[in-house]
Amino acid sequence: IGRNPFDFINHDLNIGLSQWCLGLSAALYDAMGKCLEIPAYKLMGTKVRDRVAVAAWTRPCPPEVFSREIQRAVDQGYNLLKMHTCHHYDVYEQTDAAEQVAPKRFRIQYDFNHNRSLGVVLPILKRLEKSWVVGSVEDPLVLTDIDGWRRLREKTEIPLYMHVPPLGGLQEMLHGLADGYIIGEYCGGFGDALQRGFAYSKANIPSVIQLTGGSLITAFALHMGAVLPRVAHTITLDDNYTEDLAKERIPVIEGCSPVPEGPGLGVEVDEAKLQRMIAREPSQLSKVLGITRFAGGSTLYSVGFPNLEALVGYQEGSVRGHKFDLRE
């Protein structure tokens, strides 16, 4: 407060929560760009592309829901969808379901939650290698398992992405642990994302920009993607919002979106929508019952999603055959 926003160009603004820091950075770049009447990307670097590849996102879900989410993403113009795997659903069944509905141009980025050991995850990746729809896997191993990452990368053909590198991202790159790295959320602020993005580009290693928000944050990610030479794609969860503060949504055509050319972020806020959202009562979450039916005949009841590794002692994906349902 009371400071010149130009004091914070490329600053991390580390106030404890990366999403808030990056949201604040987006607001500052919007203000600076509008002050100078230039697009925000001109304050970040030299523009190298007019459009940036973008990915849709969905929550962990059973195969039949995953099929519908893929169709939704295709209908919205995406060629790529990210989803976290989880203990409760079978990634092989999800992949089989995806192959039945996805067009040949479509790919999945699975996030494996950085919770497994090499002996568990390698056989899973070897099987997924046979699927044309699996494009990449994020965080297949515990992040601090440096030797495991190196050995896994040597043994699999699936490109591996690392999110939240424990050594800061550049040491992991020098050790050859991953084929690409996630920048943005949970990895430091905007300055860190820009610095690592340029460093990865110099090393000819792709990065993925991940932020969370609607059109405003999506625009910010596109401005970053406009100047980083080796950006693979962005993920912002914009596809999950039925409502948005912007007067116009950013289009997705053939898997990519145009970099806004207006001053600042290049997105205009609908003030009337903003006021309606401010006045709205918070949504109430329903209480849900989780039912896990194991292959041996046992049934486990839980409040919501149970922590199966803690309850039954096996790593995600190492035991198959159970079915999980949620009921209100």
Predicted regions and their residues:
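Metal- or metallocofactor-binding catalytic centers and their adjacent structured scaffolds
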Residues: 1-35, 298-303, 314, 322
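Shared catalytic-loop signature of beta/alpha-barrel
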Residues: 1-3, 12, 133, 144-159, ...
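Conserved, mostly hydrophobic/aromatic
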Residues: 24, 37, 81, 137, ...
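Predominant activation on well-ordered alpha-helical scaffold segments within soluble catalytic domains
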Residues: 25-30, 41, 96, 122-125, ...
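N-terminal amphipathic alpha-helix/helix-capping segment at the start of soluble metabolic enzymes
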Residues: 33-34, 38-52, 257
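Residue-level detector of anion-binding/catalytic polar loops
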Residues: 39, 79, 107, 159, ...
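Metal-dependent enolase-superfamily TIM-barrel catalytic cores that perform enediolate-based chemistry
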Residues: 45-156
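C-terminal extensions of enzymes
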Residues: 247-328
